[in-house]
A protein has these predicted regions:
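…and closely analogous acidic/polar surface helices at protein-protein or active-site interfaces
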Residues: 25-58
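Acidic, polar low-complexity linker/tail segments
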Residues: 1-18, 23-34, 109, 115
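Extended acidic, low-complexity intrinsically disordered regions
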Residues: 155, 180, 201-229
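Von Willebrand factor
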Residues: 71-73, 81-116, 128-130, 150-162, ...
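DG-centered beta-turn motif at the end of beta-strands
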Residues: 20-24, 36, 63, 103, ...
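Von Willebrand factor A/integrin I-like adhesion domains
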Residues: 156-207
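Short coil-to-beta-strand
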Residues: 10-21, 60-78
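Arginine/glycine-rich "motif VI" loop of SF2 helicases in the C-terminal RecA-like domain
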Residues: 51-52, 112, 139-147
């Protein structure tokens, strides 16, 4: 007699996705922070498409804001399909290093079975705290070092040197946005490309290498730095 076997649901591997968002006072100029809010809202449906193509992966989303200090804007990791963006506002200085340390502490609690995290940093200026120490703390964490890290320079005053150091692809410069439309394009590309790259490792869990990004180039920034509406 054939005895039916119980169905066994395969455990989905988690992929932790974190936006790190500059909310300093300069982000109020010409509506930059409003453009960030719009960009993330427009990016979420595209991220859902990437996730749908990788059903064995559970994408968990959080966000960190940094200004005078750093804090979790999204307090708990939330499944992408349940995630709703709450707008951020801007004021204060640029404590980017504290944001790196906050993320480092969190990644230290993430299970080793998961996929490489995705970290997308966006900033329009130079840090006002110990950003080098914060970045080193992030890279000292195994998941911080293995993360797919991309950065977006907003306007012409962003610290391109630090944004380059944050990137996990040294041959690739930070993405640049000189107006709201470009910012939407760059955040959308960075978020979906990085998410897709890390998700593909679910098919080859033994591969320790940094996942390659897809080849479609990020949008041409054109008037980078002008921030013209």
């Amino acid at each position: 007699m054939n005895i039916p076997q119980p169905a066994v649901a395969l455990a989905r591997r988690q992929l932790h996705f974190i936006w790190l968002i500059d909310c300093s006072g300069s982000m109020t100029v010409n509506g930059k922070i409003q453009a960030v809010n719009s960009a993330i809202n427009e990016t979420l449906p595209e991220m859902l498409k990437v996730a749908a193509a990788n059903p064995e992966v559970q994408v968990m989303v959080r966000a960190v804001t940094f200004a005078s200090g750093a804090q979790w804007h999204v307090s708990q990791s939330t499944p992408l399909e349940d995630f709703r963006w709450q707008p951020v506002s801007a004021s204060g200085v640029t404590d980017m290093g504290r944001a790196f340390r906050l993320v480092a502490d969190y990644l230290g609690t993430v299970s080793g079975r998961n996929l490489p995290p995705v970290l997308v940093l966006m900033s329009d200026g130079a840090a006002t705290d110990d950003v080098s120490g914060g970045l080193q703390a992030l890279l000292n964490e195994p998941w911080g070092k293995k993360a797919v890290r991309l950065s977006v320079a907003i306007g012409d005053d962003a610290d391109l040197d630090m944004l380059q150091k944050f990137m996990s692809y040294p041959e690739m410069p930070p993405l640049r946005a000189g107006n709201p439309e470009q910012l939407v394009q760059q955040i959308k590309w960075a978020s979906t490309a990085a998410l897709g790259a890390s998700s593909k490792l679910s098919h080859n869990s033994g591969n320790p290498q940094m996942p390659p990004l897809p080849m479609p180039p990020p949008p041409d920034p054109g008037n980078a730095g002008s921030w013209v509406f």
